[in-house]
Design a protein with these regions (language model features):
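Active-site entrance/lid segments in N-terminal catalytic domains of soluble metabolic enzymes
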Residues: 1-143, 147, 159-162
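Short, conserved glycine- and acidic-residue-centered signature motifs
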Residues: 23, 166-169
Length: 264
């Protein structure tokens, strides 16, 4: 990757974004734009099965440069979707376990439910691709994910849309990172708007971050080029922030660059 930033999985263009673009056009812009910027875009899953299909098709068209994220559906349904990601040559695949709280899925006849350790392990074993567990918010959840064989986790509260009063990812990230550092890749999302925000997340323990809503603006305003431009802007801002904090590389980011709340 050219930067520690990936495009987050997003679906629901019609009911979340005004419907000015089709689901297919939107996700192609995200996947193509991310690839043009030297990184990877994720695609999501939703109440309409066509949403996932659009994402997988976009990833296949981009030579596999993308990561599908599946809702926590029934085991056999998830396995079938993992197989489609595998056939598309995807870089990795995952399940957003906090999607179990999305009532719209059940209302649309697409039931979802929490996943146990055994169920996660079964899904990890059902694909040859690196497996990502998205929606981790506590250290014990992170341990379970890695014990089940996940290659990566995403510390995320689903954009604040599944549980009122849940803490932000940045609040819980340090404790989670401390519990599982070295066991796999730690990703995080939520509120990233500038390159300085990216650096903060890295200092809190993330290996890379996901960015979502701003890329909607990029896609609607400038298509794939708009997505790439926004990501490149983040990279430039991150580079500047690293220079100004004496950070030589993303692997050398230190918590020392953060100012403790107690001294503000």
């Amino acid at each position: 990757l050219s930067m520690p930033v990936l495009a987050a999985p997003m679906t629901g263009v019609l009911y979340n974004m005004g419907g000015k673009l089709s689901e297919d056009a939107f996700i192609r812009m995200i996947i193509e734009g991310a690839a043009a910027a030297g990184t990877i875009g994720m695609c999501g899953d939703g109440a309409d099965p066509a949403m996932y299909a659009s994402g997988v098709d976009a990833i296949m068209a981009q030579g596999g440069c993308g990561i599908p994220i599946v809702k926590p559906r029934a085991q056999e349904a998830v396995k079938e979707m993992l197989a489609r990601a595998d056939a598309a040559g995807a870089a990795a695949v995952g399940v957003d376990v906090d999607g179990a709280g999305l009532l719209v899925m059940a209302l649309k006849g697409q039931p979802v439910s929490p996943k146990s350790f055994a169920e996660l392990a079964e899904l990890v074993g059902a694909t040859k691709l690196p497996f990502i567990v998205k929606g981790v918010m506590t250290p014990d959840e992170a341990v379970i994910a890695f014990d089940a064989g996940a290659a990566a986790i995403v510390v995320s509260n689903h954009g604040g849309r599944v549980l009122d009063h849940a803490p932000g990812a940045a609040e819980v990230l340090p404790e989670i990172a401390s519990a599982v550092r070295g066991r796999g890749v730690i990703l995080a999302d939520g509120g990233v708007r500038t390159g300085a925000d990216v650096l903060k997340y890295l200092a809190l323990g993330a290996d890379a971050v996901l960015i979502g809503r701003p890329l909607v603006v990029g896609a609607f305003g400038g298509g794939a080029e708009g997505v790439a431009t926004l990501l490149q802007k983040l990279k430039s801002e991150l580079t500047s922030a690293m220079l100004l904090t004496g950070t030589a590389s993303v692997r050398a980011v230190s918590p020392r660059i953060l100012r403790p709340a107690a001294v503000r």
